[in-house]
């Protein structure tokens, strides 16, 4: 059940994690540990009612989890998207059931299971797209929504990342070059980045280990 407090103060807030593919453990752990940036951001939400964090379909602790284990032997080929898809389908997993519409329906089912009249939504990044889908499909479920960093449903955001990154870097380099202090500290920032890209292309290195 949601918080028993009366009026709007008792409406639970459902956190819509971004990604897509982000899990809730990091957020919950950070809040519990008292990380300042999280307590500052979520303190007002926690003060008014319950904060519900969940793992969306296929990620985090939800089952089945859509992931393929990485080989322990670094020389072995990493599983491609195609082979991972085929492996999951062999397990009888219907991948068509993992999308924003189904995630939105899960939130509706969660609201019903909680036995509350209304829910608040807090979405960041992909969570904003999910929030918009919930508002579209179940507007009567929602009392209020915080949409932080809109990911419109009609914009192919993932495919725009390379172009967006190039634009951001170009503007950063131009701004640094136009600033006397920055240009003196980081001369030819654009050229240095190009050299770094060429170096990493020739001699890449592993930054993290993922399972």
Language-model region placement:
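Gly/Pro-rich cap/lid or specificity-loop segments adjacent to the active site
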Residues: 1-210
């Amino acid at each position: 059940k949601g918080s028993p407090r009366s009026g709007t103060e008792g409406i639970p807030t459902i956190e819509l994690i971004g990604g897509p593919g982000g899990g809730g453990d990091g957020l919950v752990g950070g809040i519990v540990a008292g990380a300042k940036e999280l307590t500052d951001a979520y303190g007002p939400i926690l003060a008014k009612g319950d904060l519900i964090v969940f793992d969306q379909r296929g990620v985090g602790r939800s089952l089945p989890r859509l992931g393929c284990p990485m080989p322990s032997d670094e020389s072995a080929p990493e599983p491609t998207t195609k082979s991972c898809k085929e492996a999951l389908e062999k397990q009888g997993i219907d991948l068509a059931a993992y999308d924003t519409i189904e995630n939105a329906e899960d939130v509706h089912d969660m609201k019903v299971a909680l036995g509350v009249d209304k829910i608040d939504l807090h979405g960041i990044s992909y969570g904003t797209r999910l929030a918009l889908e919930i508002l579209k499909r179940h507007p009567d479920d929602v009392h209020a929504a915080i949409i932080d960093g809109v990911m419109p449903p009609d914009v192919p955001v993932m495919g725009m990342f390379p172009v967006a990154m190039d634009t951001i870097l170009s503007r950063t380099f131009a701004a640094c070059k136009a600033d006397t202090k920055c240009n003196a500290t980081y001369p030819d920032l654009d050229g240095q980045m190009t050299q770094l890209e060429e170096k990493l292309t020739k001699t890449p290195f592993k930054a993290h280990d993922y399972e």
